[in-house]
Amino acid sequence: MAYRDQPLGELALSIPRASALFRQYDMDYCCGGKQTLARAATRHDVDIDIIEAQLAQLAEQPIEKDWRAVPLADIIDHIVVRYHDRHREQLPELILQATKVERVHADKPNVPRGLTKYLTALHEELSSHMMKEEQILFPMIKQGMGRQATGPISVMESEHDEAGELVDVIKHVTQNVTPPPEACTTWKAMYNGINEMIDDLMEHISLENNVLFPRALAGE
């Protein structure tokens, strides 16, 4: 099956582990989920035939859960527990680790300078963002007022883009979250945590941008 003309967001939802494959190629399937596979492959200099073959292989596996068929209230409850609560745990710990690494290894050329600042900015951005969703947008959607939520949803999508930009900066200062040979245990653990946080955040944003918000605006 040809996947090149399909949006990344749709492919991430319909093919098991496609999201992990897109992350491997540094393709943005959450905020950039409307771009086609062909366009993303061109932008990242990826052979379209190779990635299509990889997706075809993944598509043979059963999908764990098709969120496109799950009631909106259940999706919201899942987002809060699986992603919002998790981000609230992840980021403070990562900030502590980054503070230590930047202080202890200040003289190392590969130290991720500014990482603490950017993680703190992401934490503040997401804390405000998630609170607005939980207090304003999610109750509207649960009450069947999704059609009237155009304004709040537009703001949330814009804030998703801002979070994505901060993630790009974090990836830049960490050499794409790759620890150097001299990295200590804390440094390596922090990078593992950052990679996990980025995976979670991309899944989180994709579920909202590509499933929850469109269905809410359609009046479900």
Curated annotation (Swiss-Prot):
Protein name per UniProt: Iron-sulfur cluster repair protein YtfE
The principal localisation class reads cytoplasm
| Domain of life per record | Bacteria
Check the record and name the NCBIfam families matching this protein: FeS_repair_RIC, PRK10992.1
Under the subunit heading, UniProt states: Homodimer.
From what organism does this protein derive? Salmonella choleraesuis (strain SC-B67)
Its GO biological process annotations read: protein repair; response to nitrosative stress; response to oxidative stress
Spell out the molecular function terms from Gene Ontology: metal ion binding
